[in-house]
Amino acid sequence: MSEEKPKEGVKTENDHINLKVAGQDGSVVQFKIKRHTPLSKLMKAYCERQGLSMRQIRFRFDGQPINEADTPAQLEMEDEDTIDVFQQQTGGLC
């Protein structure tokens, strides 16, 4: 089994991907991230930009929760994919 590896010093187009993070309010924030960078970096940057806490929101991709250690490569994300953000629901009792 031979794996195709890019030549050293040659940057591949596939090294970075652009991801969109869509909030419940319809806002969309774009991020450029390396395929093997943990998504926690994107999640923290989104929270800082929106003035939110990581405890207040949840990130989902294709309906599945995203863990901080997940990478775009692990989740098979492609360029221009969208991550959805949801407010954390708390309580339920009056």
UniProtKB/Swiss-Prot annotation:
First and last residue of the signal peptide: none
One GO MF term attached to the UniProt entry: protein tag activity
Source organism superkingdom: Eukaryota
Annotated propeptide span(s): 93-94
Record-linked InterPro entries: Rad60/SUMO-like_dom, Ubiquitin-like_dom, Ubiquitin-like_domsf
Primary location: cytoplasm
The Ubiquitin-like domain, residue ranges: 15-92
GO cellular component: cytoplasm; nucleus; PML body
Post-translational modification remark: Polymeric chains can be formed through Lys-11 cross-linking.
Subunit structure, as described in the record: Interacts with SAE2 and UBE2I. Covalently attached to a number of proteins.
Protein's name in the database: Small ubiquitin-related modifier 3
Source species of the chain: Gallus gallus (Chicken)
Taxonomy of the source species: Eukaryota, Metazoa, Chordata, Craniata, Vertebrata
